[in-house]
């Protein structure tokens, strides 16, 4: 810092005292001719500092002003004049200062007397050592509770360190300009490092939100601490991330973290018993699900009551309903990514839990200093629980799932910042949906069996420069059986698939403002299929039917095999501009699809099968951008192209079309996020998606050979989703989500032939209407969810969830006639998807009590679904003559009491 130093020099060049000559003694008794004598010099007792003139500071030179000062007999300054100038600015400053001087007066002949003195006022510009200034400070809070954390060490590599105070605040003075590695650590925190840059003339103020470590019993602390320096990771532009602890406490989930996805914006409410994910108007199979980079076929067990992965292995779950980056593909809809947590290096940990739905357990322990393992599992018994409290076979009216799942995770440390994880998963589901009838021959059933297993290995390496490498090979097996008996010949589809994949990614900083990810994403499958029964079962999206309707009398059988392979390289770069306020993330993915089917035409006795191979290479550009206009207000937008290979079950030469190619979609979205407080945020997103080349059933009653399915359908979805969220902080968390959406389809009519039936009514209502959009079978106009949970203290917590969803579209039955071939009533349909199932409305509540000891903790809870006992319709059903309409309803009030103990 530059400071002005003012000096002054007193020059007693002359003294001007009154002079007189006396011929005789004056009145004072002085003899004539006495000469006055200065007996005491004036002494400066108050010095007034003159400011160094601002106009002269740039020149930086010294200056002196010589003045004559008149001092009276009391020591005051009565006048001052410039004798030697240094310039107007210096002269004015000196005159103003000396007029405020005061002196111990001079004495002449030992008496106070007025005098005039010559005074030199010196101006000297002196450079002093600058005062240390704060140019880097910040505050540290708990990522979950948002409370400040005291005692956290913040270290700047090669400079020094500071410790946060009770307010979580820290500060550094005179940190050298440029980039610095910052390490933040504490005894109960996960150590993190980041990179910050200090610029000239600017103070850097930051806020860090740190994640607490898992609690470790006393005496079991780990000496292993791994710190890496990594560039910031960009999330998808539109995504919602839920931490495991927050998800576990959501009412209606019974402590299952992954079930919270059903309550997020953009997700339609699935019908009970389906467990389907319908995101932004896409079909359930169009949304991709990954666990640590491993693709799995489903997120929930049959019925949607439980997820297929133990919540205690989950670190976080992220839902991107659309517009996601180039790292992922092969889906037209949303993206769900689940990250499993790191295993604890010391101590034996685990939990056991049970409620009326199922029981679950997990054990986690180290094998040695570098290897640790966790094993988890779950088994349902809901049917047995319900049989205790009801006098009737509830399974005849409500679909009751039967399931189990198991997981194993092993982590081995190869060295600092280098490890291998092995993850194994398995799940099995059975679900039966029944429509009873006094006549056993008329009982209608829908049965499904799903098995899948996965084993994956993840090699992770993070380098000192912040770059990282991730390699994830995986393999697995899927087995699916569906069986329908709605009168006539039963229909069955048996699918067996061996699947495999490999993901490789390198991520690093390529410049001061860019982070680039380069990767390879491989997936393939070898599948076999066996199908018998009606050519119209199971029903497809767009089919006009009602539950329990006897299938058409066209039956057939087929067995076939398929293989699929896609090896997709991708690149994505995050470009930060304007001090990281603007991020532009361009990316591109090259997706080659190779598909083979074993039969191009149906099997004919004595003729060898002729297979077919289809190949296409798709270019998928993606772009997203975020702009943080002010600290609390940001904007975002994204678009991208997406492709999806045909389902293997659709490549039958009898029931499908072996020449099917890829389906296509385009996503466009934009929105904003406003941070109301540190804990409360509001987000709104407008979205639009367009899909083409969708696979639909051939509209013709007599399709050409191997063309039971065609690929000229179109789809579109558009709407707005909003999310008002209070993050887990202190005692409360919750959110309000709402989605207003319309999802439509346009069917292919190019191969339509005249429909025939005795009355002609069916043809009029079932025929395709060229160019006309209709409602998607899973369309829901309004979906709203309100979730809240409050810690009452003393270990008690209460929460509630309210859900509202528009019912799915259905095609009305406007009449019936007796078919001549089967002597059964056949329905006459109205306009396709012109009515809806009544709206779904449900209130759930949860109350829990937690206990904590030094050796473990426990929780007991009561989670009540459908508190009001509302009979929510799930499907429309008719009697045998289609004159009376009813509904299959969901579960009544379901109180789920449970307990959990962990150590």
Mark where each language-model region is.
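Periplasmic N-terminal accessory/gating domains of Gram-negative outer-membrane beta-barrel systems
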Residues: 188-190, 197-209, 225-325, 335, ...
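Charge-biased low-complexity segments
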Residues: 23-181, 192-203, 212-226
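Gram-negative outer-membrane beta-barrel transporters
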Residues: 577, 584, 591-593, 688-690, ...
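Membrane-embedded beta-barrel scaffold of Gram-negative outer-membrane proteins
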Residues: 141, 470-474, 480, 628, ...
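Signature of Gram-negative outer-membrane beta-barrel scaffolds
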Residues: 515-630, 645-646, 650, 750
């Amino acid at each position: 810092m530059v400071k002005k130093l003012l000096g002054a020099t007193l020059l007693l060049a002359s003294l001007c005292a009154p002079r007189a000559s006396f011929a005789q003694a004056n009145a004072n008794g002085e003899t004539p001719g006495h000469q006055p004598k200065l007996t005491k010099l004036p002494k400066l007792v108050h010095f007034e500092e003159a400011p160094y003139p601002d106009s002269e500071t740039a020149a930086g030179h010294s200056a002196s002003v010589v003045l004559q000062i008149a001092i009276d007999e009391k020591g005051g300054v009565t006048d001052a004049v410039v004798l030697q100038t240094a310039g107007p600015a210096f002269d004015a400053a000196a005159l103003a200062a000396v007029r405020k001087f005061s002196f111990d007066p001079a004495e002449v002949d030992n008496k106070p007397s007025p005098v005039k003195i010559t005074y030199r006022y010196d101006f000297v510009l002196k450079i002093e050592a600058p005062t240390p200034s704060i140019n880097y400070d910040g505050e540290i809070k708990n990522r979950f509770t948002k409370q400040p954390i005291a005692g956290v060490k913040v270290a700047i590599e090669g400079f020094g360190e500071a410790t946060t105070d009770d307010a979580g605040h820290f500060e550094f003075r005179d940190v050298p300009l440029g980039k610095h590695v910052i390490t933040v650590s504490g005894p109960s925190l996960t150590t993190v490092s980041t990179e910050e840059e200090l610029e000239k003339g600017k103070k850097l103020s930051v806020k860090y939100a740190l994640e607490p470590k898992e609690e470790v019993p006393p005496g079991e602390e780990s000496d292993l601490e791994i710190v890496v320096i990594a560039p910031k990771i960009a999330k998808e532009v539109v995504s919602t991330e839920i931490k495991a602890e927050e998800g576990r406490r959501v009412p209606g989930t019974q402590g299952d973290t992954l079930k919270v996805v059903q309550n997020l914006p953009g997700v339609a409410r699935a019908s009970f018993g389906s467990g389907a994910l319908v995101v932004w108007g896409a079909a359930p199979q169009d949304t991709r699900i990954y666990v640590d980079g491993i693709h799995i076929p489903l997120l929930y067990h049959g019925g949607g009551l439980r997820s297929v992965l133990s919540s205690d292995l989950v670190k976080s779950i992220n839902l991107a309903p659309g517009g996601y980056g180039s790292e992922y593909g092969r889906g037209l809809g949303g993206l769900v990514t689940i990250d499993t947590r790191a295993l604890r290096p010391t101590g034996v940990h685990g939990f056991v839990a049970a409620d009326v739905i199922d029981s679950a357990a997990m054990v986690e322990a180290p094998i040695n200093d570098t290897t640790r393992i966790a094993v988890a599992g779950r088994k349902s018994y809901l049917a047995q629980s319900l049989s205790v409290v009801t006098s009737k076979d509830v399974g005849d009216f409500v679909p009751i799932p039967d399931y189990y799942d198991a997981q194993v995770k092993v982590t081995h440390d190869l060295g600092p910042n280098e490890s291998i994880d092995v993850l194994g998963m398995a799940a099995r589901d059975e679900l039966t949906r029944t429509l009873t009838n006094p006549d056993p021959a008329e009982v209608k059933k829908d049965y499904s069996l799903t098995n899948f297993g996965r084993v994956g290995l993840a090699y992770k390496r993070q380098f000192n420069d912040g770059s990282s490498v991730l390699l994830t090979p995986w393999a697995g097996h899927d087995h699916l059986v569906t069986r329908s008996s709605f009168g006539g010949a039963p229909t069955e589809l048996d699918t067996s698939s061996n699947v495999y994949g490999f993901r490789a990614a390198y991520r690093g900083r390529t410049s001061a403002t860019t982070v680039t990810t380069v990767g390879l994403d491989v997936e393939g499958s070898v599948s076999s299929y066996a199908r018998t029964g009606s050519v119209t079962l199971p029903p497809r999206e767009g089919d006009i039917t009602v539950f329990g309707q006897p299938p058409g009398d066209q039956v057939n059988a087929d067995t076939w095999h398929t293989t699929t392979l896609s090896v997709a390289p991708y690149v994505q770069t995050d470009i930060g501009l304007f001090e990281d306020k603007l991020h532009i993330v361009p990316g591109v993915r090259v997706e080659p699809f190779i598909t083979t089917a074993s039969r191009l035409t149906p099997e004919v006795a004595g003729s060898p099968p002729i297979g077919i191979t289809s190949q296409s290479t798709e270019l998928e550009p993606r772009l997203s951008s975020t702009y943080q206009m002010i600290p609390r207000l940001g904007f975002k937008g994204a678009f991208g192209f997406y492709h999806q290979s045909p389902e293997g079950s659709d490549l039958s030469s009898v029931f499908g079309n072996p020449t099917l190619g890829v389906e296509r979609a385009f996503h466009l979205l934009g929105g904003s996020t406003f941070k109301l407080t540190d804990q409360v945020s509001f987000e709104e997103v407008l979205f639009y998606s367009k899909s083409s080349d969708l696979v639909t059933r051939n509209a013709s009653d007599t399709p050409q050979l191997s063309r039971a399915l065609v690929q000229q359908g179109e789809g579109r979805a558009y709407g707005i989703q909003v999310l008002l969220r209070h993050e887990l902080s202190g005692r409360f968390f919750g959110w309000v989500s709402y989605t207003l959406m319309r999802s439509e389809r346009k069917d292919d009519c190019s191969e339509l032939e005249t429909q025939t039936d005795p009355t002609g009514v069916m043809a009029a209502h079932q025929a395709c209407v060229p160019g006309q959009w209709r409602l998607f079978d899973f369309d829901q106009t309004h979906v709203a969810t309100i979730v809240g949970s409050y810690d009452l203290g003393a270990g008690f917590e209460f929460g509630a969830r309210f859900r509202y969803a528009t019912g799915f579209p259905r095609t009305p039955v406007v009449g019936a006639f007796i078919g001549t071939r089967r002597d059964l009533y056949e329905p006459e349909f109205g306009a396709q998807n012109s009515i809806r199932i009544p709206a779904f409305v449900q209130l759930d509540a949860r109350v829990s009590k937690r206990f904590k000891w030094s050796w473990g903790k426990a929780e007991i809870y009561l989670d009540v679904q459908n508190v009001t006992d509302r009979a929510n319709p799930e499907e429309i059903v008719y009697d045998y003559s289609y004159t009376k309409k009813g509904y299959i309803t969901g579960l009544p009030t379901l109180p789920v009491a449970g307990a959990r103990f962990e150590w």
